[in-house]
Swiss-Prot record:
GO molecular function: DNA binding; zinc ion binding
Family: Belongs to the RecR family.
Function: May play a role in DNA repair. It seems to be involved in an RecBC-independent recombinational process of DNA repair. It may act with RecF and RecO.
Lineage, top ranks: Bacteria, Pseudomonadati, Pseudomonadota, Gammaproteobacteria, Pseudomonadales
Organism: Pseudomonas aeruginosa (strain ATCC 15692 / DSM 22644 / CIP 104116 / JCM 14847 / LMG 12228 / 1C / PRS 101 / PAO1)
InterPro entries recorded: DNA_Rcmb_RecR, Rcmb_RecR, Rcmb_RecR_Znf, TOPRIM_dom, TOPRIM_RecR
Limits of the Toprim domain: 80-174
Listed Pfam families: RecR_C (PF21175), RecR_HhH (PF21176), RecR_ZnF (PF02132), Toprim_4 (PF13662)
Record flagged with keyword Zinc: yes
Gene3D superfamilies to which the protein is assigned, alphabetical: 3.40.1360.10, 6.10.250.240, RecR Domain 1
The protein's name in its UniProt record: Recombination protein RecR
Length: 198
């Protein structure tokens, strides 16, 4: 079947979403056009509003509608702890554990094959955040994947000898898993059982 230019454009736009292939994008596009035009318009408005109104927190770099996200704006949080995560969904996951420290959000993990080196994921900004803060412990909560482990190792080597306690989230998080998919109890156990990196 040959689609009109506007429908093809909609299908291709939907394909940028993770896990959405050609067939799924076609089904979504046709469902919106045939059965739920008002829902499609709401989706378009919400997407436009979010793209225009959501930026990054100037301190931790998570997604935020304000200059400071709620976690960075909260004066009751523990300024001695800094939790380093790969993305904004990881902040949400760690928050579910009751963690009360500060965050730094990388832009993913080191992946030389994809052209993602230290600068691309924000390592210089992390160094500046640590230099300007009063942190005594840095918790490396990157995903327990090969790339996440490599990123944690790189950061640990970079921060060694700076008088900081460096720890890595521990057991409870499955190897090869993603933090955003781990339940809160498991992640709380992993944070409580974190271990120093030597």
């Amino acid at each position: 079947m040959s689609f009109s230019p506007l429908i093809r454009q909609l299908i291709e736009s939907l394909r940028i979403l993770p896990g959405v292939g050609q067939k799924s994008a076609q089904r979504m596009a046709l469902m919106l056009l045939e059965r739920d035009r008002s829902g499609g318009l709401k989706l378009a408005q919400a997407l436009t509003a979010a793209m225009e109104g959501v930026g990054h927190c100037r301190q931790c770099r998570t997604l935020s509608e304000e200059e400071l996200c709620p976690q960075c704006a909260d004066p009751r949080r523990d300024d001695s702890l800094l939790c380093v995560v790969e993305g904004p969904l990881d902040v949400f996951a760690v928050e579910q554990t009751g963690y009360r420290g500060r965050y730094f959000v990388l832009k993913g993990h080191l992946s030389p094959l994809d052209g993602l080196g230290p600068e691309a994921i924000g390592i210089p900004e992390l160094e500046a955040r640590i230099r300007d803060g009063a942190f005594s412990e840095v918790i490396l909560a990157t995903n327990p994947t090969v790339e996440g482990e490599a990123t944690a190792h790189y950061i640990a080597q970079l921060l060694a000898g700076r008088g900081l306690t460096l720890s890595r989230i521990a057991h409870g998080v499955p190897l090869g898993g993603e933090l955003e998919l781990v339940d809160g109890g498991t992640l709380a156990h992993a944070l409580a059982g974190r271990r120093p990196i030597s």
